[in-house]
């Protein structure tokens, strides 16, 4: 009985000790909450702004940018798409697979004496290689206004493909008006087919980009075994793919497809790769491995307006097709014929082809440059290194593009850092304990006052992460118009 009485006598003391501990804990929590309110009320932000005002808004990200390059090895795409290249002034090649291909020869010697092409009979007797013939068909159907059938001869004896186009003119009137003749149309199509390689035997006429001149009288297309034919230029699929996507009867479908469906870069399991994309040794020339972060890959998956993104799609398509479909040459050609509009931007290819003909620096889809931020390790989306007069431009020729790319990288990093900072909510559990202390009341007062921390241009949204001075300009160069009205905001 005495023990029970003693226990109840001690209960008030126990409660008092517990209350003291609770009060101490609540006081600590209230002080922490007060510190948090002071940190978020704008006072510290105001002091920071005043200290940083007038300095570059990208100071924390300023560092050393390295200009780096990569060169793609497109020879590895030969199993799923035709590759074009050049051996010398008159011999050009289309590679299909590892053992076969087509030879496109500019010559003054005719090898076919007749002026007809019995294609239906050859097809009925299955005389030719269908994968090679589909490439020739694409070439022939791309010739504009082909209406002089005597200008074309073909022969399929023993399965050997021989197609001959007559580039000479029978009449002086045709020679004088070459630019509108069938011969010019054949040469135009040949230039587009061989583009990405070289067509050094041709002259664009200099005064008119769509008028192609040559001293040769015949263009002969024959099947051939594959050897080391690519001596003058590296193999590239861009010429054939551009020709394929630009076929007149497919233009409307092409435009619709570009707006509704594109190839999405994927990982080894076929899933989208938000974490980045790596080019391995077999995709590159004289390099081991190049990886690009999720920012670059996300841009490629969202947009269809960069040459580098087109090449990533081609490499990814090639990898998936070889592993999943294990297609033969004929099936591969059929597949790329159907998929081309989803893989590449035909307008980009045509633009670069026209720039080449007109003597303007153009992209040959082979070499690219990008910036590497040394302190963060982040890289920009590679951009094509343009070519002029047969050689790559000097860095000084596109220094403005390099500077703009650096500014874009800084802006993207600042925006990402700001979004991450806004998404954090420190001390969320403290909001459960709202008790009044003197410090807490002061912090509440400061929080309600909402001390302004930065300037806004009147009538425009928040400029963060950029910092404006009293003239309404930012030292990083984005806001360039001085004297605009500004006001302070929290």
From Swiss-Prot:
Q: Where does Zn(2+) 2 bind?
A: 454, 456, 462
Q: Where is the lipid attached (N-myristoyl glycine)?
A: 2
Question: Which residue spans traverse the membrane?
Answer: 18-33, 432-452
Which positions does UniProt annotate with glycan attachment?
78, 88, 98, 108, 118, 166, 223, 364, 372, 389, 394
Query: Which ranges of this chain reside in the Extracellular compartment per its record?
Result: 2-17, 59-431
Q: List residue numbers at the site (Important for GP-C-mediated membrane fusion).
A: 33
Q: Does the keyword Nucleus apply?
A: no
- Per the record, ranges on the Cytoplasmic side are 34-58, 453-490
Domain of life from the UniProt record = Viruses
Q: At which positions is Zn(2+) 1 bound?
A: 57, 466, 474, 476
Ordered alphabetically, the record's keywords are: Disulfide bond, Fusion of virus membrane with host endosomal membrane, Fusion of virus membrane with host membrane, Glycoprotein, Host cell membrane, Host endoplasmic reticulum, Host Golgi apparatus, Host membrane, Host-virus interaction, Lipoprotein, Membrane, Metal-binding, Myristate, Transmembrane, Transmembrane helix, Viral attachment to host cell, Viral envelope protein, Viral penetration into host cytoplasm, Virion, Virus endocytosis by host, Virus entry into host cell, Zinc
A GO molecular-function descriptor: metal ion binding
- The region annotated as signal peptide is none
One biological process term from GO is: fusion of virus membrane with host endosome membrane
The chain's disulfide connectivity reads 85-230, 117-154, 179-211, 278-291, 300-309, 363-384
Homology family: Belongs to the arenaviridae GPC protein family.
Entry protein name = Pre-glycoprotein polyprotein GP complex
